[in-house]
Each structure stands twice: as C-alpha cells, then as structure tokens.
Amino acid sequence: MAEGVFPGAIGIDLGTTYSCVATYENSVEIIANEQGNRVTPSFVAFTPEERLIGDAAKNQAALNPKNTVFDAKRLIGRRFDEESVQSDMKTWPFKVIDSNDAPLIEVEYLGETKTFSPQEISSMVLTKMKEIAEAKIGKKVEKAVVTVPAYFNDAQRQATKDAGAIAGLNVLRIINEPTAAAIAYGLGAGKSDKERHVLIFDLGGGTFDVSLLHIAGGVYTVKSTSGNTHLGGQDFDTNLLEHFKTEFKKKTGLDISGDARALRRLRTAAERAKRTLSSVAQTTVEVDSLFDGEDFEATITRARFEDINAALFKSTLEPVEQVLKDAKIAKSQIDEVVLVGGSTRIPKVQKLLSDFFEGKQLEKSINPDEAVAYGAAVQGAILTGQSTSDETKDLLLLDVAPLSLGVGMAGDVFGVVVPRNTTVPTIKRRTFTTVADHQTTVTFPVYQGERVNCKENTLLGEFDLKGVPPMPAGEPVLEAIFEVDANGILKVTAVEKSTGKSANITISNAIGRLSSEEIEQMVNQAEEFKAADEAFAKKHEARQRLESYISSVEQTVTDPVLSAKIKRNAKAKVEAALAEAFSTLQIEDASTDDLRKAEVGLKRAVTKAMSTR
C-alpha cells in the first residue's frame, strides 16, 4: 500500500448477510473485493490454521459449520435472554453462550476454544471492508461512516460504534440505512430540485426499515420511521428450509435437524432457490448425499414459496402504514416509493407494496445492494470536507429518533421525554418529583420503546441522583434532560433545581456495552489476529512457491533436452538439493523461513549446475 492516509471517510453498509463499501473521490465508487464482488458476505470463519472473512468464509461454511459465524448483526446490542436471540440460536450451527446476559459466540480457533462478542465479529467484517477500500485507494483508511437499521435502539447503535473502534476506525457518524439510501436516490438522475415525499422501503437480509422523507433541494428531512430489526431474507430462507426438511423427512423418514453440515447445505440450496424464483416461476433443488447417503431433490414453485412466507410478506406493510400515520400523510401524497435491500427483488413483496399504493410504479433506479453504502460515502465526504460537487456540498440530513426515550416512573409507568420521530440531534426536558417523604436519592431508569408499561420497553441503563434535600413527597423539582446526538446515541442528565445538584449517564452500562478498556483489549487482540492471518498467508505463499519451484526443477531433471544443459558432475547435487527441499515441504509445521531457505538452496544448486558448461 502506498504511504499516506486517505483524507476522506469511507462509507460502510454493515449488513446482516452482506456488506458493501464505497468511497468518494470526486464521485462515489462502490469498491469490489478481491473476488471482484461488490458485496462481501458478512461471514467470519475460524479454522485450526487461520481466520477467513467474507467470500472465503462463506464458501467453506458447509465443511466447517460450527466455526463459521454469520448474523452477528442479529446479536449485536441484544441481551442473551431476548426472544429473538433464543429463537435464532435454534437455527444457527455455531454456539452462543451467556456471559452476564450478554451473548458470546464460542468457536474452535488455532486449536483452542475461544469466545467472541458480536462486536468483535462485526469488527472483523468492518476490518475486511476497510482493507478492500485500502487496496483500491492505495492509502491507509482511518475514518468511516457506518450505517445501521433506522429501527436500531441505543444499545445496538453504541455496540456498532464499538465494533468500528475495535476495527481501528474512527466512526464519524452512525447513519440510518434508509436515510443513506435516500441520499443515493436523491442524487441520482438529476432529481435534486423538485420538492417531494419519498418512502424508502428497505428489506435486507436480516432487518427491515421504512422511512418517510421530505426532500427539498439538498435538505433531506426524515418525517417518520418504523420497521423490524428482525425480519429479512434470512427468515424467508429459514421458512423454505423448514419446508424442505419436512419434504426430505416424508420421502426418507430421516430428520436432519441435528446435523449442522446437512442444514448448512440445505440452507444454501434454499437461498439459491429463493433468488431463482425472483426471475422464474419454478425451480428444482438438488443436494447430493444430503444425509445418510440420501440425495435430496424437490421442485418448488414461486406460488408455493409465496405461500410459505405469506404472513412475513404481509407483515412488511404494517410499518408502511405506521410511517404514514406518524407523519400524518396520506398514501396518495407519496411521490416515490424507493426499493432498497436485496429482498425487495422478490416479486410478491413488490406486488403487495404496489397494490398498497393503488398500483403505483415502484422506483427501482438505484441498486438495492449498493445504495446504502453509496449514501454513507457521500455523508463521509461531507463530514470530512471532501465533497466537491454542488449538490453534495449543501446536502443536509435531518434524521429522527426511531423510538421514544424516557424514564420509568412510580408503578412502572413510562414517562416519555423524547417522543419517537423527533428530529435529532435534540435536547428535551421533563420535570419529575419524589414519591416518598424526605427522599434524598432518586433513581432514574432510562427506557426506550412505545409501551406504557416500562417492562415492555428496553431498559438502556439507570443512574442515581443523590443529595436531594429532604422535603415532603412531591415538592422537589427534578429535571431530566435528554440529549440525543446525530448518531442517535443518548446522554441523560438529572438536576435538582433548588440545589443545582446533578447526575448524568451516557448510556454505557447497558447489557453487552463494552468499556473503553475492553475495547482497547479487543483492538490489541484484533491486531494479533491480523498478524496471525498475515503470517499464515506468508507461510502459505512460501509453501506454494517452493512446491511450484520443486515441480519445475523435477521437470528439468527428467526432461532429456533440459537435463542435457546440467553439468555432468552437478546432476547429483541438484537431485540432493531437490530431495532436501522436498523433505522440508513434507514438514507440516515448517516455518516460512525454512520454506524460503529451502527454495533459495535449491535455486542456488540449480544456478550452479546450469552455469556455462
């Protein structure tokens, strides 16, 4: 890599199933990985020798299912006991364990059992995306804008930011995926003048968002947002997988539920069938020797696939209704419905949405897999002063808090301080008081959600305001100040008005939240893993080079024409050097140095033997 640091910030769409990276240098460029793919699987695999990330990890998943990790985005910022985590664990081949109610992933790596947090797995994917960008730019990348689902809560946003820090990135901003896609749409095809209401429908591999924006000139104002952080292509695959499992059991009497490898192979076939059914009405699925020597073969029609997923497809319209209701806008006032995310390629999803908007033509002008990274790269250029075009220079993003924020009051009633869909950054205040006489300490539990009963919402953290003057209940005036920054991350301060005593919390003690020490430790660990990966790659390369050189020397020695060029008395020396090099190659744990020395030694013997006779 060339010296120097990239002055801008890359845009990374950190997806559940695939990730994408873009840069801005005079214009946006989506960067392909070393396989030439513009999206990279969000997979990390661990083997006895190495760690693989991206395509290489996904390609070996069926052979190594228990140590191939994916779906980290479905774990990040969540508690172990959450319903979605427990149900996902039933479908994952890798092991998830409970560590103080935070989920950890357990794998075998370099011959040892190791555990990783979802943040660490995500950081490995982010590192991969950073390296893909660096290979193209030729400079070191230090800054990034990373996207998250609009409906991610505070804990999930903070955990994503931590993943960036572990990857050695300064995450300038966490932005919402549909908002990033809106930028890509707004900047495309000279659409930036007309004032319009745009609905972004973003259905990806694991998450679903709907955002309603008002775009006027370069000002993008999010009016409302809704979604489901646990709905996407993976769920459609799972339903199809269950259908195929039942078919296989009917035909053979065999149940593959306990076999991780068979499940992985069948899931891959289900995913392929799902994609094929977006363009044809019927497809055949074949998996040789799926389980116990039995082959699997089945025909699936698009109609059957739609039937299997009917309830999930239909559920995508609920957030659409919600955003219209929240923004107080009639569906007839929506100028464009923009499709984002790979799962919007499914014809039934498109039909339901078009029918909902009275047969409206859906907007498909942007690439559903790349739009989010595109928008993130534009935002990265703006934040680092690298944007050159007039239309990006004046671009302004006004996003919203996706869920209400507030405190738990007496009787577990949720006291909303920041209503959902409030434009961020924002500062909101609300006054509270004591519930008992002479109360000197007041606990402020901070929640996020839409339910009146606090237990139904997400507890983000809590803190105590001490030193409240002892007064009769109801007399002290306690003010809660909620500050939400542009990343959607919250800081809460409580002040007792008569004394000015205050206490505050940046929501950092939520379950699974990493301390700065833990992040630092993980950064160092990530460096070690990177060094181990590089050492393995060098050793692999040295082994391959030695192998290929041995092979070419063997050809020379056995070829009558070529061997005639070797000095008469030197042939034995070449053969001895060849035998020595071959024996080094046979040593499984031969070091990179030993392999290189063997190659140099053999080259020396050949050069001497071939020098003018």
Swiss-Prot record:
GO CC, alphabetical: cytoplasm
GO molecular function, one term: ATP hydrolysis activity
Taxonomic lineage: Eukaryota, Fungi, Dikarya, Ascomycota, Saccharomycotina
Enzyme class name: hydrolase
Catalysed reactions, semicolon-separated: ATP + H2O = ADP + phosphate + H(+)
EC id: 3.6.4.10
Gene3D superfamilies on file: 1.20.1270.10, 3.30.30.30, 3.30.420.40, Actin, Chain A, domain 4, Substrate Binding Domain Of DNAk, Chain A, domain 1
Summary of subunit composition and partner proteins: Binds to ribosomes. Binds close to the ribosomal tunnel exit via contacts with both ribosomal proteins and rRNA. Directly interacts with nascent polypeptides. This interaction is dependent on the ribosome-associated complex (RAC). Interacts with SSE1. Interacts with FES1.
Name of the protein in question: Ribosome-associated molecular chaperone SSB1
The species this protein was found in: Kluyveromyces lactis (strain ATCC 8585 / CBS 2359 / DSM 70799 / NBRC 1267 / NRRL Y-1140 / WM37) (Yeast)
Keywords: ATP-binding, Chaperone, Cytoplasm, Hydrolase, Nucleotide-binding, Protein biosynthesis
Function, as annotated: Ribosome-bound, Hsp70-type chaperone that assists in the cotranslational folding of newly synthesized proteins in the cytosol. Stimulates folding by interacting with nascent chains, binding to short, largely hydrophobic sequences exposed by unfolded proteins, thereby stabilizing longer, more slowly translated, and aggregation-prone nascent polypeptides and domains that cannot fold stably until fully synthesized. The Hsp70-protein substrate interaction depends on ATP-binding and on allosteric regulation between the NBD and the SBD.
Gene behind this protein: SSB1
InterPro entries recorded: ATPase_NBD, Heat_shock_70_CS, HSP70_C_sf, HSP70_peptide-bd_sf, Hsp_70_fam
